[in-house]
Design a protein with these regions (language model features):
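Gly/Ser/Thr-rich helix-start
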Residues: 97-99, 134, 139, 160, ...
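Glycine-rich phosphate-binding P-loop
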Residues: 128-148, 152, 178
């Protein structure tokens, strides 16, 4: 476990390359794009290939899971995006928090499209939006919340595969669901780590013990009080991740035969509790 710093996170299965091609092919069918980001890592969860893929389509960014992110940091991110001319909303798609602003925002961002439709005698034409994002950012939760329990699939459009379905969500809006897609290589290893921390990279393709040690080392430097309050152990900024994980395992009684720490069980618990917000509301990166 001592060499955990040397391992890098990478994950780009073949189906993601296919999804990327499908997104490009389906863009002519939509009026705009809704991008789901994780509010805890807005930079790392933004696919850097999207700007070139969407080719200038109007875009709305949803900073999802804002309920487990630092609210002050989320405000800073929204302001930073606004300074770049991008529209961003803080939402929690599971509870519906913040989504009341979505329809009015669509009307505002797609104002020119609506006016153009009216001039062409197509007033009331449904606005079609493609929903994109990396895995585990909440695209399905967003569509389920917007469409309701009895969500109605719109008839398949030309060029749309069975994995990419349209849903009518009211307000004259149709959403096109797409599978989560990453990009081929994380140039910054910290981006790969953060995506693995939040579960956007499958645990099966990482060493969860190694990953959790990295997470605990980050939190030990930046949010030691969160670890202290949750696990009742002493932490300082000089402790290595494996030392913190060991202390947590011992405190929780995760022991194997002979009194050895069960590192895997400890890692699973810490990762799950971090992702579920049980260590408190926190954001792992801030805008420059």
């Amino acid at each position: 476990m001592a060499d955990f710093q040397k391992q890098k996170v990478q994950w780009f299965p073949g189906h993601m390359a296919k999804t990327r091609r499908q997104i490009k092919e389906m863009l002519p069918l939509v009026d705009g794009v809704v991008e789901l980001l994780d509010a805890r890592v807005p930079y790392s969860s933004a696919n850097p290939e999207l700007d070139s893929l969407v080719r200038g389509k109007p875009r709305i960014m949803l900073l999802n899971k804002c309920d487990v992110a630092d609210p002050a940091a989320t405000k800073r991110w929204i302001a930073a995006f606004a300074a770049q001319g991008k529209t961003a909303l803080a939402v929690d798609c599971r509870s519906g928090k913040g989504l009341s602003a979505f329809l009015p925002t669509v009307q505002q961002v797609l104002k020119k499209t609506i006016e153009k439709n009216t001039q062409r005698g197509m007033a009331g034409k449904p606005l079609r939006l493609m929903v994109v994002g990396i895995p585990n950012t909440g695209k399905s939760s967003f569509i389920n919340r917007m469409a309701g329990k009895n969500r109605a699939k719109v008839a398949d459009k030309a060029g749309v595969t069975r994995q990419n379905q349209w849903f009518a969500v009211g307000g004259g809006i149709e959403l096109l669901d797409t599978p989560g897609v990453l990009w081929p290589k994380f140039d910054d290893p910290e981006v790969g780590d953060r995506l693995a921390f939040i579960g956007s990279v499958k645990d099966e393709v990482t060493d969860l013990e190694t990953l959790t040690c990295r997470l605990l080392e980050v939190l030990g430097r930046t949010r030691p009080q969160a670890i202290i309050q949750r696990y009742g152990i002493e932490v300082d900024e000089y402790m290595q991740g494996w030392e913190i994980l060991e202390a947590i395992g011992r405190k929780r009684g995760f022991l194997m035969r002979g009194g050895e720490i069960d590192y895997n069980r400890s890692a699973v618990i810490v990762a799950d509790e971090f992702r579920g917000g049980k260590l408190g509301r926190m954001t792992l990166e801030l805008p420059e």
